[in-house]
Curated annotation (Swiss-Prot):
Catalytic-site annotation from UniProt: 20
Top-level taxonomy: Bacteria, Bacillati, Bacillota, Bacilli, Bacillales
The UniProt record lists the keyword Ubl conjugation: no
Binding site for substrate: 28, 98, 120-122
Disulfide bonds: none
The keyword Transmembrane appears for this protein: no
Record-level Gene Ontology MF annotations: D-ribose pyranase activity; intramolecular lyase activity; monosaccharide binding
Name this protein carries in UniProt: D-ribose pyranase
Length: 131
């Protein structure tokens, strides 16, 4: 049995398979998930698990080079935006329109769906390298 890092076998497998610049999305419960993209659904009820809880666990286990967010989060969910900026201080940040964000999700290796039910609580994590 694994005792450190991500315990969810689907998430652990996705993270282990990532190459440089591959992407993983952590999403609220309302983000549309495109056909053909792996869905890892963690939502058990509204708010559980939270977006920030899942982000923290994944970020602790992943080399992240860049973060993409919908620009709408800045005004419509400033608290989540602030928390993301505080948790992920090393990667570069990119803000795009929500429509562009949804287009980018079509290229993700996986989308991890949380129980989060606040606006624009979604992030695209771009894999970096560990060397």
């Amino acid at each position: 049995m694994k005792k450190h890092g991500v315990l969810n076998s689907e998430i652990a497998a996705v993270l282990a398979s990532l190459g440089h610049t591959d992407t993983v999305v952590i999403a609220d419960c309302g983000l549309p998930i495109p056909d053909g993209v792996k869905r890892i659904d963690l939502a058990v009820e509204i708010g559980k698990p939270s977006f920030l809880e899942v982000l923290q666990v994944v970020a602790d286990d992943m080399a992240i080079e860049k973060v993409t967010l919908a620009e709408e989060v800045i005004i419509n969910n400033a608290e989540v935006n602030k928390e993301i900026e505080q948790k992920l201080i090393e990667p570069a940040f990119e803000y795009v329109s929500h429509e562009q964000f949804k287009e980018h999700t079509k290229k993700a290796k996986a989308i991890i769906r949380t129980g989060e039910a606040t606006p624009y609580a979604n992030v695209i994590l771009h894999a970096g390298v560990i060397f």
